[in-house]
Curated annotation (Swiss-Prot):
HAMAP family: 3MGH. This is Putative 3-methyladenine DNA glycosylase. It is an enzyme of class 3 (hydrolase). It holds the Pfam family Pur_DNA_glyco. Keywords: DNA damage, DNA repair, Hydrolase, Plasmid. The keyword Cell division does not apply. The lineage of its organism: Bacteria, Pseudomonadati, Pseudomonadota, Gammaproteobacteria, Enterobacterales. One of its GO terms (molecular function) is DNA binding. Signal peptide: none annotated. Its EC number is 3.2.2.-. GO terms for biological process: base-excision repair. Belongs to the DNA glycosylase MPG family.
């Protein structure tokens, strides 16, 4: 059941794997769109070779080093945007990639894949570094849902594939 409560900074300022699992079943709101998060991946710090911050701080990865609860949106392959939410303490680069949602408003549609999700919702780099803990049309709402999930290797990467840091609702 959807609440009117937007997830707080303290929700995101925790261990990234815990945040990733706990985001499953929560409702992502962007503009007029609402969708239940059903698939995520965790990227954790400079020791994670698949994490964008593995090579350190750059202008592109600046958001990952910032405060928890902010968006980190980037472009891959020069054509697909990806939405992440920054986690853990400021200065430690970690984030959760939102890989899929079940859109239910204004239309019902399953969006599997971060590129499809961002394209349909029109999330772009203009939405980078947005505080998702504030009510401004781009946030994540709490729910009472605690879906069962499976943990699998992350996909679409060439390094760090040994980690079971992709979580998908069952």
């Amino acid at each position: 059941m959807l609440s009117n409560t937007i997830l707080s900074r303290s929700f995101y300022k925790r261990d990234t794997l815990c945040v990733a699992k706990d985001l499953l079943g929560k409702v992502l709101k962007f503009a007029d769109y609402y969708g239940v998060i059903n698939e995520v991946e965790a990227y954790i710090g400079q020791d994670d070779p698949a994490c964008h911050a593995a090579r350190g701080y750059t202008p592109r990865t600046a958001a990952m080093f910032g405060a928890a609860g902010f968006s980190y949106v980037y472009l891959i392959y020069g054509m697909y945007h990806c939405l992440n939410i920054v986690t853990e303490r400021e200065g430690f680069p970690a984030a959760v990639l939102i890989r899929g949602i079940d859109l239910y408003k204004p239309t019902v549609l399953s969006l599997n894949g971060p590129g499809k999700l961002c394209k349909k919702l029109n999330i772009t780099k203009n939405n980078n570094k947005i505080d998702l803990t504030q009510s401004h049309g781009f946030c994540v709402y709490n729910t009472t849902a605690r879906p069962e999930y499976m943990a699998t290797p992350r996909i679409g990467i060439k390094v760090g594939t040994d980690k079971l840091w992709r979580f998908k609702s069952m």
